[in-house]
């Protein structure tokens, strides 16, 4: 196991996927004389932990009066009263074994320890002294606190109320007689489990034993989990490690983050569960979309080149320096918590920007080559986002830099508004934005049920509508989450099942309720039929062509929001996605023919419900939005299925060769290949089941059959029918890869025919077969 002795940069983010949102970093081995770099580390690197902070921590430290042993029950009674107050405000107590040893030190010494280790104990950067019972000049160094109680609160208001009540409790006369000293501390940017870390970049050659030896040097390991590929059985190169204390995890991050082990560079960071990261993210979004609290700013119309230096590109470092230079005059503590300035390459690997110890810019691509395509890829897109310490500084930045002339460009700076994620995952846009947005009349369509969901969707990418920082109006730029989809190679015609899908076969007849309840299964001649996505199409993601070039993401969202809950919307622009596949077959123009930031005339809309997506296609495909523009709407192609239909058929043939040893028992399965999107079919079946909660008695209609051996029966679970029971029959459906579950249907079983055919039915795509007799009879009720 080889470990390269290299200085490591401290990075605080939620994982490798977030490395393009960079904090200002400095090397741990920076020279002591460079005070500016030290100050930068103290503020930016520490404050970046706010992106992961997910709880509010309360710490109560108590030193008891010297008492007889029989009076110890009084101390326990006081402790119980404190814990009752914590529970009253829904606080969660922290296990005593998870309490850091420095919490028992006198306050002055404890603060000295934190100051000396400020570059290590990053999780303590939000700690503040709330109140204490003695003055600083009364403190002595030869004592320790006897009891330390810690609790976590979800809401800052609960923390504040608990602090007030506990402070009054400790000051009360009966309790004060038993306490010598006490102090209360708070941390509104704490981690729930500061001992948990994420480890990325693990070389596949490293064994569990080697990893355990490497990480156990910083403390006992409670647990270690490596993630493996389920199909290949190989490690994915990342995992999770838990230490008992946050100080041990912080020391590990300090020493190993950025080190090269067995040829692979480690990325180590505090770990917060995905659900917690999503909650933190949306808390920040709510704050930023509130005009009274926002701290995140959009900066547009940035110049591409520095005219004072020939062929020199503008870097994020230069933008940050200009902002700091101006605003530090008003705010001595001014700082930028995080920033994001995308490059024209629009790839995560090349858009990641960091600072080395000399302050120069480093990226995954060489910035020395300023010629040809390399220069274009390293060039910024002309816009970015920054997050400041507080709202007051954000307002000052807008006042100072909105309209500020820099290298011949007039900057556009305003509040970065993140759109609500859609229907109503969040109501983010409740307050008017500083930006000006054109309102578009919401179109009303038929068959547009609205659903009310309160779920959140994690939004990891920022986008804006105008990608050109040097032209056009950038005042209406917003950022949205991405629609991670792949364009279809050409327009896909909407597919409606043919009549043969439910034609009457030997010994069967289609149950009448199927045609009545499942609109999508009705014949094309009916007035209302839902389109069905194929297996190589996405069930909830729409590809919309021929949209007006003036439409933005918000306009496209407003157009479709009446159909149901929308997860994300994206209008594709020049200079945006570099996907080599184009949605339009006639889209052969190069980016040089169009201004950067202009719309390509197509986009994506991702719905939460597949049925809402189908209804949107039904209502808007062929819809005339203007005199010369008619929308063309279809299901988006799945990633990796961008070839023509012929190629797709060939790929399916190739895939099917894996199962060449499997031969269907009859021609029925050959006639109905699995080409429908299974998730869509499942959603359709689920909706039908919820609408048809019919009891057994409602369907059971006893009928007289000429033969006395005939028995009326009901089928309640078409999949789990008992093949040994001659009274069970299963209706035949097209092979969707599974047997759809439907409400109970009565059938009349005729006398058994010894010569009846046996038709195998594949249940849920498994290899287990269930055989059912199919005599010459018809089903009715």
From Swiss-Prot:
| Record PTM Phosphothreonine, positions in chain | 486
Q: Any idea which residues bear Phosphoserine here? A: 29, 433, 435, 482, 485, 501
Which biological process annotations from GO are given for this protein? negative regulation of G1/S transition of mitotic cell cycle
Q: Where is the composition biased (Low complexity)?
A: 347-364
Q: Which SUPFAM superfamilies match?
A: RNA-binding domain, RBD (SSF54928)
For this record, the Gene Ontology CC terms, alphabetical, are: cytoplasm; cytoplasmic stress granule
Assembly and interaction partners: Interacts with RBG1.
Q: What is this protein called?
A: Uncharacterized RNA-binding protein YGR250C
**What is the native source organism of this protein?**
Saccharomyces cerevisiae (strain ATCC 204508 / S288c)
């Amino acid at each position: 196991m080889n470990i390269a002795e290299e200085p490591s940069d401290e990075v605080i983010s939620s994982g490798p996927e977030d490395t393009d949102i960079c904090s200002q970093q400095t090397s741990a081995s920076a020279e002591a004389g460079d005070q500016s770099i030290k100050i930068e580390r103290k503020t930016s690197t520490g404050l970046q932990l706010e992106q992961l902070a997910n709880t509010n921590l309360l710490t109560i430290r108590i030193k008891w009066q010297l008492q007889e042993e029989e009076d110890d029950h009084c101390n326990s009674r006081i402790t119980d009263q404190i814990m009752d107050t914590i529970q009253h405000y829904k606080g969660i107590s922290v296990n005593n074994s998870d309490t850091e040893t420095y919490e028992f030190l006198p306050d002055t010494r404890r603060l000295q320890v934190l100051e000396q280790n400020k570059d290590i104990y990053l999780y303590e950067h939000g700690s503040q002294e709330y109140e204490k019972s003695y003055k600083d000049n009364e403190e002595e160094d030869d004592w320790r606190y006897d009891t330390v109680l810690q609790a976590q609160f979800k809401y800052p208001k609960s923390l504040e109320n608990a602090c007030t009540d506990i402070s009054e409790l400790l000051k009360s006369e009966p309790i004060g007689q038993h306490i010598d000293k006490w102090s209360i501390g708070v941390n509104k940017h704490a981690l729930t489990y500061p001992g948990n870390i994420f480890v990325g970049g693990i070389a596949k050659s490293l064994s569990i034993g080697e990893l355990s030896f490497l990480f156990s040097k910083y403390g006992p390991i409670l647990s270690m989990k490596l993630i493996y590929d389920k199909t290949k059985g190989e490690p994915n190169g990342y995992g999770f490690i838990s230490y008992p204390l946050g100080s041990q995890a912080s020391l590990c991050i300090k020493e190993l983050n950025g080190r090269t082990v067995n040829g692979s560079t480690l990325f180590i960071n505090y770990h917060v569960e995905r659900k917690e990261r999503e909650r933190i993210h949306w808390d920040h979004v709510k704050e930023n979309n509130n005009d009274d609290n926002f701290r995140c700013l959009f900066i547009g119309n940035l110049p591409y080149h520095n005219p004072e230096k020939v062929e020199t590109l503008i870097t994020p470092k230069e933008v940050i320096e200009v902002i700091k230079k101006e605003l530090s005059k008003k705010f001595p503590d001014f700082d930028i918590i995080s920033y994001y300035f995308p490059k024209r390459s629009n790839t995560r690997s090349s858009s990641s920007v960091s600072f080395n110890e000399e302050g120069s810019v480093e990226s995954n691509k060489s910035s020395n080559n300023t010629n040809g395509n390399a220069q274009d890829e390293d060039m910024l897109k002309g816009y970015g986002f920054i997050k400041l310490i507080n709202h007051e500084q954000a307002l000052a930045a807008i006042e100072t830099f909105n309209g500020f002339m820099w290298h011949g460009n007039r900057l556009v700076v305003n509040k970065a508004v993140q759109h609500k994620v859609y229907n109503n995952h969040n109501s983010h846009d409740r307050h008017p934005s500083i930006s000006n947005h054109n309102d578009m009349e919401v179109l009303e369509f038929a068959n547009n049920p609205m659903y009310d969901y309160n779920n959140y969707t994690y939004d990891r990418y920022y986008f804006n509508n105008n990608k050109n920082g040097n032209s056009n109006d950038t005042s209406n730029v917003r950022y949205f989450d991405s629609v991670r989809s792949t364009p279809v190679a050409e327009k896909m015609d909407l597919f409606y099942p043919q009549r043969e899908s439910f034609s009457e076969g030997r010994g069967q007849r289609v149950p009448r309720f199927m045609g009545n309840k499942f609109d999508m299964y009705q014949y094309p001649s009916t007035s209302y039929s839902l389109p069905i996505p194929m297996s190589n199409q996405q069930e909830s993601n729409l590809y919309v062509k021929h949209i007006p070039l003036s439409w933005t993401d918000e306009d496209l969202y407003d157009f479709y929001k009446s159909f149901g809950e929308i997860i994300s919307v994206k209008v594709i622009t020049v200079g945006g996605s570099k996907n080599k596949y184009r949605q339009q077959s006639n889209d052969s123009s190069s980016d040089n023919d169009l201004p950067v930031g202009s719309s390509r005339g197509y986009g994506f809309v991702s719905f939460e419900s597949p049925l809402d997506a189908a209804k949107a296609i039904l209502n808007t495909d062929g819809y005339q939005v203007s005199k010369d523009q008619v929308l063309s709407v279809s299901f988006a192609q799945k990633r990796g299925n961008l070839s023509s239909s012929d190629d797709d058929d060939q790929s399916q043939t190739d895939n099917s060769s894996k199962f060449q040893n499997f031969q269907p028992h009859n021609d029925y399965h050959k006639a109905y290949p699995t080409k429908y999107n299974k998730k869509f079919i499942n959603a359709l079946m689920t909706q039908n089941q919820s609408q048809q909660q019919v009891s057994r008695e409602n369907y059971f209609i006893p009928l007289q059959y000429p033969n006395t051996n005939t028995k009326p029966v009901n089928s309640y679970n078409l999949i789990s029918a008992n093949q040994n029971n001659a009274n069970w029959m299963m209706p035949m459906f097209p092979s969707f890869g599974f047997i759809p579950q439907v409400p109970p249907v009565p059938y009349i079983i005729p006398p058994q025919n010894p010569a009846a055919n046996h038709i195998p039915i594949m249940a849920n795509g498994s290899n287990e077969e269930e055989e059912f007799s199919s005599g010459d009879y018809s089903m009715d009720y």
